[in-house]
């Protein structure tokens, strides 16, 4: 039976849509503390202000991250959520679980916590909502010793790396995202669990430009699969698509009256760089102009495939609004080989290069993208030891002045004044 009146929350149960309110009420029948979370959220809706205290450091021994402190500022009114800490558990690569593992994890959370979960957080972790301070250490012991699972990242550290399904299920993946994600997760355990950065830092691994983990928009360091040779074309299948014998988009739009497939309107005219055209019944591509956006491949997957020389692009600096607003990542390295054969050493070298610089010059609570913005891209790529490329140009220059670095000027900027006066006597 409900412990609190929640008329505002009850409105969220109306209609045909899933409702977190209904979910919490169902869980409250098993764990009465959940009635208090509904009561506090109702009060927050009524007062139009959160009733979680700001901050609060709590954790498990030896770890600086993985637990997000939550304390109620009205504990006498809602004692069940006086402590209601969030636990982040590192998800397996690509979020593959056995039902046995999920049942064991849920049983553990019912034992030590509220039983409420969020599968998954936007970074990727398994989010376990609601644990009292005194239950954290017993939960952590059982999680690590019985289930052999670990906490994820929180705070100013490396957040839990995340990846798409990669080559386990997707034929477009240009590198093994699961192996890369798992290897770097294990390689950087200290950085995940012991905050040492100016602010959070996120890796995300997408196998192709479809970017199913939104790495370009949500990660400080995005590794996005690509290729550097030509798109592979099966001209016979192109003819079949044009004739309507193969459904476009892998049949994803079946059931609607979309009319006959129009390769000109649906593929060629939508190419962002206009690098495609038809010659008779053959599709032609100027691969030197192709941006590897994946659109044509998505529409005609049986006719087009990524090139055979595969790797990844590295983009850096994406973030949600913090100081300077949301921003997409900037392309830093157009192509790099990503392989477990060398234990991803070339990727690790780039990561540690930027960390060394960012930890030195980054301000407190400043994402690496904001540091890049503050110092300017020319300074950043110089620090990274890279040459500028056209993709780094945001807009055409708007002033007539050209800055020359000292080393770019023959003889530098230093001049002998006495020698100058001899040659230019008054």
Language-model-derived ranges and their functions:
Residues 1-73:
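Charge-rich, low-complexity segments
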Residues 2, 10, 23, 27, ...:
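Small-residue-enriched alpha-helical segments and adjacent helix-cap loops
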Residues 110, 114, 144-148, 189, ...:
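Generic secondary-structure signature for well-ordered alpha-helical cores
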Residues 114-121, 153-155, 194-200, 278-279, ...:
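Flexible, glycine/charged-enriched surface loops at secondary-structure junctions
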Residues 161-164, 201-210, 368-381, 401:
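A glycine-rich phosphate-binding loop feature that marks nucleotide/adenosyl-phosphate handling sites
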Residues 220, 263-285, 289-315:
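Iron-sulfur cluster-binding cysteine motifs and their immediate structural context
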Residues 319-362:
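A hydrophobic, small-residue-rich beta->alpha segment in the mid-to-C-terminal subdomain
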Residues 379-426:
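C-terminal, charged low-complexity interaction regions
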